[in-house]
Amino acid sequence: MTAQPPLHHRHHPYTLFGTSCHLSWYGLLEASVPIVQCLFLDLGGGRAEPRLHTFVVRGDRLPPAEVRAVHRASYAALASAVTTDADERRRGLEQRSAVLARVLLEGSALIRVLARTFTPVQIQTDASGVEILEAAPALGVETAALSNALSLFHVAKLVVIGSYPEVHEPRVVTHTAERVSEEYGTHAHKKLRRGYYAYDLAMSFRVGTHKYVLERDDEAVLARLFEVREVCFLRTCLRLVTPVGFVAVAVTDEQCCLLLQSAWTHLYDVLFRGFAGQPPLRDYLGPDLFETGAARSFFFPGFPPVPVYAVHGLHTLMRETALDAAAEVLSWCGLPDIVGSAGKLEVEPCALSLGVPEDEWQVFGTEAGGGAVRLNATAFRERPAGGDRRWLLPPLPRDDGDGENNVVEVSSSTGGAHPPSDDATFTVHVRDATLHRVLIVDLVERVLAKCVRARDFNPYVRYSHRLHTYAVCEKFIENLRFRSRRAFWQIQSLLGYISEHVTSACASAGLLWVLSRGHREFYVYDGYSGHGPVSAEVCVRTVVDCYWRKLFGGDDPGPTCRVQESAPGVLLVWGDERLVGPFNFFYGNGGAGGSPLHGVVGGFAAGHCGGACCAGCVVTHRHSSGGGGSGVGDADHASGGGLDAAAGSGHNGGSDRVSPSTPPAALGGCCCAAGGDWLSAVGHVLGRLPALLRERVSVSELEAVYREILFRFVARRNDVDFWLLRFQPGENEVRPHAGVIDCAPFHGVWAEQGQIIVQSRDTALAADIGYGVYVDKAFAMLTACVEVWARELLSSSTASTTACSSSSVLSSALPSVTSSSSGTATVSPPSCSSSSATWLEERDEWVRSLAVDAQHAAKRVASEGLRFFRLNA
């Protein structure tokens, strides 16, 4: 091991300017005094390069009860205790976490300053450079100085592989996947209770351009990763470990928790082998220790002396930077999420002098998270899922007298395999007009900057690559709810105040708003007033600027507003806030960058197009170009050719099998068909419905639309990313699998038998994936939109019949469709020669006919598709 050199280039002999990167528990010394070690980044003060150091900090003496809680048992022992029930085991974990968290966040006045990681501080050390004696927030340090210093360091990318023993079930009991879910919660917890372990470990660290592989006790390799310094403190010998060139360790969200824990245990044994002094605490808390699982978050209270976290996939891991790591840690608002509410900081809100009385803006506070979806009650008609689960044949919606905003909540069929119970419904909005997605770009960041001091959180740090500032701010606000209720409520109230006034102003100006998400994203139609057309973008921008100045005063303009994209007016809300439609629903890459929508089944994966998107296609991209297309330019391209033509099999020797390399052009779609996931493909097809259904369609035309979805599925049938879904732990039947994976949100695919198959992005697609479940779900969405569209047309025509006492009988063709001033499609009623009763009777008959036609088309095309998938499995 190499010895750490002494400190250099101080502004004062004992003073350093920099930032705390991580606090970890070293141990208890004499008189129950806790010792915390601090990984500190010295900014260098412009005289030297930034350097990493490890110091120790004394905590306040612990009471005997907390000392016993620390010494009594490790996290693993508490989680696997056989003499206690599940509730008692959880209480034991929470009690241990509360003691450790209190010391690491509030153990002393110095620790309270250093616990606010990645914010500038000034410290003073003793003469030997071992203990921090004083610490205070650094004033006048530019944000750019911290960002520039972090850019010189890396994140260590860790990948661990290994072997597992066979799990032998007792002879008298056979544990099916269903019984595992009922009795153990997750496979991971069952394995923990039975002493599951890993062996033959091999680990790889990538730091910058260097890669280090450890398969044995290679101290020479470890010396390049960690510097070791032995010091004497309070008559005790300590060994301080400092990372070389990196400030955090990242793993993929598919890394087995057991392998990760075993890897750090092995490194601990090597680094402290033969050490006669007191080693640091070695413990681990992860989702595998909870009976029903938890967030994919890891808490190593003692060793390693760096933060450890997961990112979304190997590709993202390889691009992780130190700035991303800082953003991830800042978003925790304290310790990793797995620690729970006890691991969050107390943040005091700023005292605001607002131009609006408190009772006017505080009423808009809500417990909903930052990514919550708010639906317009007049645009969406909600219905509970009925007991009759016939294949997508919902009852007609009641007539609320609102013909322009026709939405119904529809039961979905999943073939027995679906995410949690909220998956049982769809909520659909369809309107023949261009819907705009208006974004208030920096609203959340600017409100947070007004409400929280920079020493608690600085929203203006430059993040890069994986994380966007908004995602970091959103997660930080979410974590304020646990121990900083006043700050959380203040921020949520101000965001809600602006958001509610935006939607109210839209309604007053004659604009139909359909949905808002996260206080900053609005789906709005243009409108008309007595003076002419009204732009949704102009309306939102004006309202935001007005109420921003009303709240905060001054000449500072309000947050930036812009139309992010526009598309046909089709939106489907699937289950709990999952959106499907012809829009760019991008949800980040996990971690702090991941929206809440990404942590549930059906969150969209980021798709990429190799070139510019064609004008009629909106698919998933990381950044929207704004404006977008109508989504209806490729109307009837999928009507012919059959599955073999779409799959590219041609006449390949008479074989029924197809080539997996079929180009997207074979779909009859645009180049962008190769991007996004299966929900993106469905959303693209949904965007074609308004243009297609302006005239009465035949069964063959309906079949062509369903077949287009099927063609897209066939072309991507071997693409793992296309089919992946993200499932919550303990909520589904999961097939047995190697390792410890299903204890946290994990990636998987549906199986035909109703189970979930754990699926890695980096392995071949499971052979028994349930393509039929995906087809069933996609066709259910399309059928729901077709039915709602028919109701919109017919409710508009019903309003028109009130002007006359009778109507003519419907002809064989659908009556002509015109566009009203508000952009809503209307059906011209027949001439006043038949009674209104006859018109209503014919209307209901047409609705039933269209619904039945759509269902028959879906069943026929689904039968074709399932036969094809079976032949080409």
From Swiss-Prot:
UniProt xrefs under Pfam families: Herpes_HEPA
Any Gene Ontology biological process: DNA replication
Gene Ontology CC: one annotated term: host cell nucleus
Disulfide bond entries: none
UniProt keyword Transmembrane helix present: no
Localization in the cell: Host nucleus
Family matches, as InterPro entries: HSV_HEPA (IPR004996)
Swiss-Prot/TrEMBL keywords: DNA replication, Host nucleus
Region (Disordered): 394-422
The family this protein is said to belong to: Belongs to the herpesviridae HEPA family.
Family matches, as HAMAP family: HSV_HEPA
Quaternary structure, from the entry: Associates with the primase and the helicase to form the helicase-primase complex. Interacts with the origin-binding protein. Interacts with the polymerase catalytic subunit.
Stated role: Component of the helicase/primase complex. Unwinds the DNA at the replication forks and generates single-stranded DNA for both leading and lagging strand synthesis. The primase synthesizes short RNA primers on the lagging strand that the polymerase presumably elongates using dNTPs. The primase-associated factor has no known catalytic activity in the complex and may serve to facilitate the formation of the replisome by directly interacting with the origin-binding protein and the polymerase.
Protein name in UniProt: DNA helicase/primase complex-associated protein
Gene name for this UniProt entry: UL102
